[in-house]
């Protein structure tokens, strides 16, 4: 099969628009349009599944507490038992990005006397950033002497403690369940959108929540790259690597040009011109967004003016009620 012109005639988004006024380090919303019917749903579903399962993150993978041999122990001077401490540690969200992605890091902690052990205590150097520093880990009294090592690793998805037992080398090390994924929730919606006179294209709106260790924008980019790399194996022909020139759709350009014109260029009657002026409609793009009902509700708008405007708009391939363009 020839690779030439495979995408000819396909409507594709030229860029992704992130809604900057609502985006935060933990939340992002973006819109991509137009897609051919069915493709918006396919891409939205694929991105969602990949985001939820395949984005790398960091988590605590194992702990070793001095004087403790198993997770069903108690520690003198600590209110919580080891099982509760482990449950709390599983909730710690960490940003850890070593140059060697395979490298793990061991944190050594010594906590003595009365106080609270919080997630912030794990940020022992600049390579570790805790995204939920106020998370409570344990309560210590004046007799406490908590000495522990915690191993941090990078990975994907969820890895149960059972799968790590075979890799334990140091006696007394307790593996714990690791939730590596930095993605907390992903939602997407596909709606209809208009291109020129056709309204059967798709608009993809996606919302992404993360723990803050990766931005929603970067997470979406990583998911797209993962999908692209997996799909490459299905291409059974050589692709020419060349810089793509952005193709300007002639119909789209004509529509944009028409909508940006001043209503005076319609050469309307004095009566119709005065009505548009009273409604503060200066450009054709503003005019076509109005419905016929909205126009006829105007005090001085007559049936004759409506017919005149409809005829002028029709001659340009436009009509009332064009809200999506």
Swiss-Prot record:
Catalysed transformations (reactions): RNA(n) + a ribonucleoside 5'-triphosphate = RNA(n+1) + diphosphate
Superkingdom in the source lineage: Bacteria
Enzyme Commission no: 2.7.7.6
Record bears the keyword Transcription: yes
Alphabetical list of SMART domains matching this protein: RPOLD (SM00662)
GO cellular component, one term: cytoplasm
Entry function: DNA-dependent RNA polymerase catalyzes the transcription of DNA into RNA using the four ribonucleoside triphosphates as substrates.
Subunit and interaction comment: Homodimer. The RNAP catalytic core consists of 2 alpha, 1 beta, 1 beta' and 1 omega subunit. When a sigma factor is associated with the core the holoenzyme is formed, which can initiate transcription.
UniProt protein name: DNA-directed RNA polymerase subunit alpha
Higher taxonomy: Bacteria, Pseudomonadati, Spirochaetota, Spirochaetia, Leptospirales
């Amino acid at each position: 099969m020839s690779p030439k012109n495979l995408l000819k005639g396909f409507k594709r988004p030229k860029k992704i628009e992130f809604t900057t006024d609502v985006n935060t380090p933990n939340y992002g919303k973006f819109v991509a349009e137009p897609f051919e019917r069915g493709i918006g749903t396919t891409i939205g579903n694929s991105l969602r599944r990949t985001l939820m399962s395949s984005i790398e993150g960091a988590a605590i993978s194992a702990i070793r507490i001095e004087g403790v041999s198993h997770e069903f122990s108690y520690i003198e001077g600590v209110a919580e038992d080891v099982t509760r401490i482990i449950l709390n540690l599983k909730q710690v969200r960490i940003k850890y990005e070593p140059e060697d992605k395979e490298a793990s890091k061991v944190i050594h902690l010594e906590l003595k006397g009365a106080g609270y052990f919080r997630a912030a205590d794990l940020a022992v150097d600049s390579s570790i950033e805790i995204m939920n520093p106020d998370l409570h880990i344990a309560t210590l009294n004046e007799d406490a002497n908590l000495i522990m090592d915690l191993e941090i690793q990078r990975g994907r998805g969820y890895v149960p403690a059972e799968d790590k037992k075979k890799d334990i080398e140091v006696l007394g090390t307790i593996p714990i369940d690791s939730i590596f994924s930095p993605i907390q929730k992903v939602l997407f919606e596909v709606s209809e959108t208009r291109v020129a006179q056709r309204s059967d294209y798709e608009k993809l709106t996606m919302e992404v929540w993360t723990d803050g260790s990766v931005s929603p924008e970067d997470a979406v980019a990583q998911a797209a790259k993962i999908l692209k790399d997996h799909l490459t194996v299905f291409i059974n022909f050589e692709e020419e690597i060349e810089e793509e020139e952005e193709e300007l759709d002639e119909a789209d350009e004509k529509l944009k040009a028409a909508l940006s014109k001043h209503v005076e260029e319609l050469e309307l009657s004095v009566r119709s011109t005065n009505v548009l002026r009273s409604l503060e409609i200066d450009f054709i793009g503003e005019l076509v967004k109005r419905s016929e009902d909205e126009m006829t509700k105007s005090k001085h708008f007559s049936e004759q003016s409506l017919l005149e405007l409809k005829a002028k708009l029709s001659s340009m391939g436009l009509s009332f009620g064009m809200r999506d363009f």
